[in-house]
């Protein structure tokens, strides 16, 4: 039986661990933290599973493989919601919406009443839009917790340690999933900046 050590228990490490367990491997997860939390990039992820929208600027493999992502996450967790993606623009920006449509697939055009049905809070504000019905989103923190629990429940082991990948590699198959922390080995590695903003203002529509 194949045995593998995975260093890093963020989203990448957990996905690798789950996939290897599903193929009958013995898996050990090693991370310097006991649980997922604010220290991990994936803790702050938006959770969009929107490969067709990503296709506006992403390469073909992102779209092709991304189309499988919602099914995978739905099979492994209960964190997925399939409600589609709605893209709208102000009247003065309809050329941008048309450009977005030219660069993407997997959508249908929607008019004002359809937009109102999809998103009542947008009623009477937009005359046209694009609806990517097959797209989804997940709750990242719930997904991380459930994926970790399933890995441990199905025989995966966990070691809390600030691991040296080179040391583990001498013992056997080792997969480095430390993310940005791997910059000590991959000197040109860079992070992708993102922001999360949560707004709650019930009195303003």
Go through each PLM region and give its residues.
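Extreme N-terminal leader/targeting segments of oxidoreductases
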Residues: 1-4, 128-129
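N-terminal Rossmann-like FAD-binding beta1-loop-alpha1 element of flavoenzymes
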Residues: 3-28
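Glycine-rich FAD pyrophosphate-binding loop
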Residues: 22-41
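Short loop/edge segments at beta-strand edges and connector loops
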Residues: 31, 111-112, 158-163
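Dinucleotide-binding Rossmann-like beta1-alpha1 core, especially the glycine-rich loop
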Residues: 46-118
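Helical element adjacent to the flavin cofactor pocket in flavoenzyme catalytic cores
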Residues: 126, 130-173, 177
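Flavin-dependent oxidoreductases
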Residues: 171-205
């Amino acid at each position: 039986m194949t045995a593998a050590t995975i260093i890093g228990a963020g989203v990448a490490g957990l996905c690798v661990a789950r996939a290897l367990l599903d193929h009958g491997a013995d898996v050990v997860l090693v991370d310097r933290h006991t649980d997922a939390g604010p220290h991990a990039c994936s803790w702050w992820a938006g959770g969009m599973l929107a490969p067709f929208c990503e296709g506006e600027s992403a390469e073909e493999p992102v779209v092709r493989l991304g189309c499988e992502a919602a099914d995978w996450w739905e099979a492994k967790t209960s964190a997925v919601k399939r409600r589609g993606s709605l893209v709208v623009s102000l009247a003065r920006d309809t050329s941008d919406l048309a450009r977005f449509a030219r660069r993407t697939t997997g959508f249908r055009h929607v008019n004002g009443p359809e937009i109102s049905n999809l998103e009542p809070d947008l009623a009477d504000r937009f005359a046209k839009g694009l609806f990517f019905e097959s797209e989804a989103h997940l709750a990242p923190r719930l997904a991380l917790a459930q994926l970790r629990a399933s890995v441990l429940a199905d025989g995966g082991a966990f070691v809390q340690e600030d691991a040296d990948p080179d040391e583990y590699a001498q013992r056997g198959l080792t997969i480095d999933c430390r993310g940005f922390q791997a910059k000590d080995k991959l000197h040109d590695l860079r992070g992708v900046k993102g922001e999360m903003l949560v707004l709650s203002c019930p009195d303003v529509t």
